Structures are given as structure tokens and as C-alpha cells.
A protein has these predicted regions:
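Predominantly flavin-linked oxidoreductase catalytic cores and closely associated redox partners
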Residues: 58, 67-71, 155, 164-333, ...
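FAD-binding beta-loop-beta segment adjacent to the flavin cofactor pocket
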Residues: 345-376, 490-502, 512-524, 531
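N-terminal Rossmann-fold NAD(P) dinucleotide-binding loop
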Residues: 49
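Extreme N-terminal leader/targeting segments of oxidoreductases
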Residues: 1-41, 55-74, 198, 491-515, ...
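Iron-sulfur cluster-binding cysteine motifs and their immediate structural context
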Residues: 518-578
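Active-site-proximal substrate-binding core of FAD-dependent oxidoreductases
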Residues: 71-72, 372-378, 390, 394-437, ...
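Glycine-rich Rossmann-fold phosphate-binding loop(s) that bind the pyrophosphate
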Residues: 44-46, 80, 154
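N-terminal FAD cofactor-binding segment of flavoenzymes
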Residues: 55, 59, 71-131
Length: 578
């Protein structure tokens, strides 16, 4: 393992220059004539946040007396992207029950007509890939079974949820970043939006618009994975006490228009193109999902690669591993002759049950991915986002009606399918921190026993505490040809990413770091944000160039030694079918 002469080098030895409580917690509200007052402020306009809004408005529609308690603007949704769902990305296959519970009048045919659903899973296959050319079909593991589930786009689902919420009376503020959580007298009392029109040095430009305080009776943190305000709230209210640290994975996805339909859902579980040796610390897998657009008749395929951010080889790159995976005959037979029509990248929480923070605090609750509600064994989280949003809305409504504490939301989660499913896989990912070969037997035991293992609770260590070395994973990455294999910058381009060249830098990292850390950031980032100068020394500290305008806000840097903060509202990708 490479070192600086003083032992192994891990990203957490070079923490980002940020103090979440000092910077992202605002103490007290502005004067009454300088703020916006709403009933419920929801930070994040994607699956979980919009589920909260829609369910709450359903309940209030039949209860004008309670609705009146929330004032002229009963529900406001703050979304940093240009539109709801524009920063949302997932595979995605959803267990349909959660959407049926939220929208009981909608059939699955209705979902497809609204173009956020693309067909029921009727056939599926799981393969092991021993090498770049070989494949071995294996029985579908119980947790992987998807028969009867629905293939969807979370970006498109969010747009549909937004429309329903607005029709029901929600006030949706897009292009608005939630920059600070407002705390007064020990309770969350709202959110402050970010400034617009600042320059590179944070100076006010001609078009400068200051942020404003949004006072709220209740606040819902639905920021998704890595939740900026959620992270500050966890520290402020000690919501992580007695919990394991959160850990992450990074997924990179493409959508292809193909000449012939894929007739089944496919997962692969490696080891190729990852390295099997424990020293590389690589765990990951892939998906290929058929998507039939009933409106246009187009046959589409969602393809993605997910890698655990626990890895040790600094040259591990989820984007390049996806390009390498596409060279396998299994994949080429599906995609060849087609056209890539979309690309995106997003981190996802992988810590599971023991890493979920306390879900409520005075004045606020946390929902969905922001709370870590992802079952990485079943590769599922969207249905948990929907259910948690629904239960949060019901807890807020009951609090309004009866004065019940928001902690009732936590009890509801524990008793729901979310709590039960997350608990059953509570110890199934931690063993992989010892490597695939050593960890797999314990993982299988944990799956078979529904989480029962010696000791009862397996611990995590943070992704950024794993020492990095400069390995040879990158030696296998193919060269881009612009037709089938793509580089990072052309991929960022088709994501619709737009960030002002003179905007302030929203990424916090130490600029001078050992080569191992710099290489790790360079390869990790799917958008090519981190660059090492050509004349940088081969060993020792290097000065990292941060091309922050490339950023698609995937959040992976937070797992590997930096910190993503919200850019100016409206910046970032414009995902449509991811």
C-alpha cells in the first residue's frame, strides 16, 4: 500500500474546511416583514418529499379546519434543481404497493400513460461474470426477485408528483437551494434559502438576490443522499447517537434507445470487472432494465454500475467501470446498434438499519434517502421513500389535530414495511468491509437468518477512513470512441448540466493533498470535477484543481473526504428519464 512515509493515507486525514453547525444552522428568524411564512416546508422535490406533500394535502382536503391552521401557504416545497426530479436518479424497480397506497385511484396503466412507468417485470436473470467474456447464470437470490414489480424513472415520477401536489394547493419553489436550517429555542422553525447572483469570490453581482427565511410550523428534510441540511441537523440535535456511521455507494447510469426490446430484467454480481482481491476493497454490481415507452413506442434500456465507496484502489471509477462492463458480450448483444440518450450519476446511502439517524427532532422530520432508507441487498429504496413520505405526512397531520409528538413518525416507520424490511437486512452489508471473499459467507448467513448474527449488531467504519493506494484498476478501462464508449465530459454534457462559470465554488475539499487522495478524487468523480496538473509530482502533496462547474451533485465526494454543499439554485443536471 502506498504511503507518505508515515503510514497509510486515508481521506479522513484531510477533512474538508467546513463546520456544518456554524455555517448551516441559522440561529433565529429574521424580522416578520422580511420572511415568508408557510405551514409545512419540505426541503427536496423528489420522491419522498413529494409523497409527503401529496399525502398531507389529501388529508387536509377533507379537513378545512385543520387546513386553516397552516395559513395561506399550507405546504411549500423547496427544490434546488430547475424542476422537481431534475436531480433524481435511480435504477429503478419499485415494489408497487407504496404507490398504490399513496394514489389508490391510479392503476399501473395510468402510471405508464403518465410516462413514469415502463412495464411490469415478468422475466429476470442474474449472472456472475467470471471474466470479460464469460457469464454464468445463477438462480435468482430471494432478495433479488422482482417478478411483478414495476420499472420506473424517478425523475419522471417526481414531475408527476409535482403536478398533483400543485393541483392540490402546494407552493413549489424550484431553483431554490435550502442553505440553512433555522433553529430557535431548541426547535427547527424553518429554512433559509441560498443567495443568487454571487461571483467566484462570493461577491455580489449586478443580479444579486439575497436568500430569505421561510418560517414553518413543520419542516421535512427530504434532500436525498447526501442531505446537506440533514447532516447539520444530525449534529445539532445529536440524531446519530448510538448509531453506526452512514456509508455510501455510487451509481452511474445510462439510458439507451435500442433496436430490439430486452425481454427481461438482468443483474450481474461480478466479480468482473472489479478486482476480487481484498486489497482493492471493491464491491459492486450492475443492472440492465427494459423500458418500453408506451407513448412513443421506443424500446429503451436502463443500464447502470454501482460501486461501494469503501474501495481502496484510488483508480476505481464507477463511470469507467460502466464503460468497461459494456464491452462484455452479454451487454453488447443488448446495446449494439442503439443510441445513448441519457446519462447520470448519484450516490446512495448503504449503511442500512443501524445507520439510520433518529428521524424526528423538535419541529422537523427526515424522510427517504436523507434518512438512509435503502435496502442494498434487495437493491430497493424508492418504495421506502414513498412510504416514509406518506407516514411523515400522517404524523404531521395528527400533530396538527391532536398535538401528538412528531416522534410518532419514528414509531410508524418501525412498524411499517420500511422498518421491517430494513431490520431484516440490518447486518448484511457490513461483512463486505472485509472484502468480497472473506465477507460473502457472513453476508449469506445474515440473509438466511434475516439479520441474526453473532453479537447481534455488526459495526461500520466510514468510507473515508479506508486508506487509498494507487492501483491498476484503471488499466482495464477502455478508450472512449464517442459512439459506444464515452468519456466523462461528454456524459456531463448530455445530462443537461448547467452551472455558471462565475458561480461560487460549492465543493469543499483541501486543495493540497497527497497524490493518493488526489488520484482517488480524480477517478471517483463521474463528472471530471477533480483534476491533477500535468506537472504535479509523482509522490507527495499535489494541488488539486476543482472544476466545480462540471459537478452533477452526485454527492460521492462527501464519502471520500470532501463535502458537497448546495450550489446556486437552478444549477446542476437536468435529468428527465433517469
Amino acid at each position: 500500500m502506498a504511503s507518505n512515509g508515515k503510514g497509510p493515507i486515508a481521506p479522513n486525514q484531510f477533512p474538508p474546511p467546513v463546520d456544518p453547525q456554524k455555517e448551516f444552522i441559522k440561529r433565529g428568524l429574521d424580522a416578520e416583514d422580511e420572511l415568508i411564512e408557510v405551514g409545512v416546508a419540505i426541503v427536496g422535490g423528489a420522491t419522498a418529499g413529494l409523497a409527503t406533500a401529496n399525502r398531507l394535502l389529501q388529508l387536509l382536503a377533507d379537513d378545512p379546519e385543520t387546513l386553516e391552521k397552516l395559513g395561506e401557504v399550507p405546504v411549500a416545497i423547496i427544490e434546488k434543481a430547475k424542476s422537481c426530479g431534475a436531480h433524481a436518479l435511480s435504477g429503478a424497480v419499485i415494489r408497487p404497493e407504496s404507490l398504490h397506497e399513496l394514489f389508490p385511484d391510479l392503476s399501473r396503466e395510468d402510471w405508464r400513460k403518465e410516462r413514469f412507468a415502463f412495464g411490469e417485470v415478468k422475466k429476470e436473470a442474474v449472472y456472475m461474470l467470471p471474466s470479460a467474456t464469460a457469464k454464468l447464470k445463477i438462480p435468482t437470490p430471494p432478495n433479488f426477485k422482482n417478478h411483478g414489480n414495476e420499472i420506473i424513472s424517478v425523475a419522471a415520477l417526481a414531475r408527476y408528483q409535482q403536478r398533483l401536489a400543485e393541483e392540490a394547493g402546494a407552493y413549489v419553489l424550484t431553483e431554490t437551494a435550502g442553505m440553512q436550517l433555522i433553529v430557535q429555542d431548541g426547535a427547527v422553525v424553518g429554512v433559509r434559502s441560498g443567495d443568487k447572483g454571487r461571483g467566484k469570490e462570493n461577491e455580489e453581482l449586478r443580479n444579486f438576490e439575497p436568500g430569505s427565511d421561510m418560517k414553518a410550523r413543520y419542516t421535512v428534510l427530504a434532500e436525498g443522499c447526501w442531505g446537506h441540511l440533514t447532516g447539520a441537523a444530525i449534529k445539532e440535535f445529536n440524531l446519530g447517537e448510538g448509531k453506526e456511521p452512514q456509508v455510501w455507494e455510487l451509481g452511474v447510469k445510462e439510458v439507451w434507445k435500442v433496436p430490439k426490446p430486452l425481454d427481461r430484467l438482468i443483474h450481474t454480481i461480478g466479480p468482473w470487472p472489479l478486482k476480487l482481491s481484498a486489497k482493492y476493497g471493491q464491491i459492486g454490481g450492475t443492472w440492465l432494465y427494459p423500458m418500453k415507452d408506451e407513448t412513443t413506442g421506443d424500446d429503451l434500456v436502463s443500464i447502470g454500475f454501482v460501486v461501494d465507496l469503501e474501495y481502496a484502489d484510488a483508480t476505481t471509477s464507477a463511470h469507467d467501470l460502466l464503460q468497461q462492463f459494456k464491452l462484455h458480450p452479454l451487454v453488447k448483444g443488448i446495446l449494439e446498434g442503439g443510441e445513448r440518450v441519457a446519462w447520470g450519476a448519484k450516490a446512495l446511502p448503504a449503511g442500512g438499519y443501524w445507520s439510520m439517524p433518529k428521524l424526528s427532532m423538535p419541529g422537523a422530520v427526515i424522510v427517504g434517502d436523507a434518512a438512509g432508507m435503502v435496502d442494498t441487498v434487495a437493491l430497493k429504496g424508492v418504495h421506502h421513500c414513498v412510504t416514509s413520505g406518506r407516514l411523515a405526512a400522517e404524523a404531521i397531520y395528527n400533530s396538527l389535530k391532536t398535538g401528538a409528538p412528531l416522534s410518532a413518525y419514528e414509531d410508524a416507520i418501525e412498524k411499517s414495511s420500511v422498518g421491517k424490511e430494513m431490520y431484516q437486512v440490518r447486518n448484511t452489508r457490513q461483512p463486505f468491509q472485509k472484502g468480497f471473499i472473506r465477507g460473502a459467507p457472513m453476508v449469506n448467513i445474515a440473509i438466511m437468518t434475516k439479520g441474526k448474527v453473532p453479537g447481534g449488531r455488526l459495526a461500520w467504519h466510514t468510507n473515508d477512513s479506508t486508506p487509498l493506494f494507487i492501483g491498476d484498476t484503471a488499466d482495464g478501462y477502455p478508450k472512449p470512441d464517442g459512439k459506444y464508449i464515452f468519456d466523462k465530459l461528454s456524459s456531463v454534457y448530455i445530462s443537461g448540466n448547467v452551472t455558471r462559470d462565475d458561480a461560487p465554488n460549492h465543493i469543499r475539499v483541501q486543495k493540497s493533498v497527497p497524490r493518493e487522495i488526489a488520484e482517488g478524487w480524480k477517478w471517483m468523480c463521474p463528472a471530471g470535477v477533480y483534476e491533477i496538473p500535468d506537472d504535479a509530482p509523482a509522490t507527495g502533496p499535489v494541488e488539486v484543481i476543482v472544476n466545480y462547474t462540471n459537478c452533477v451533485q452526485c454527492g460521492a465526494i462527501t464519502a471520500k473526504g470532501g463535502r458537497l454543499t448546495p450550489p446556486e439554485g437552478g444549477d446542476g443536471p437536468l435529468y428527465t428519464i433517469t
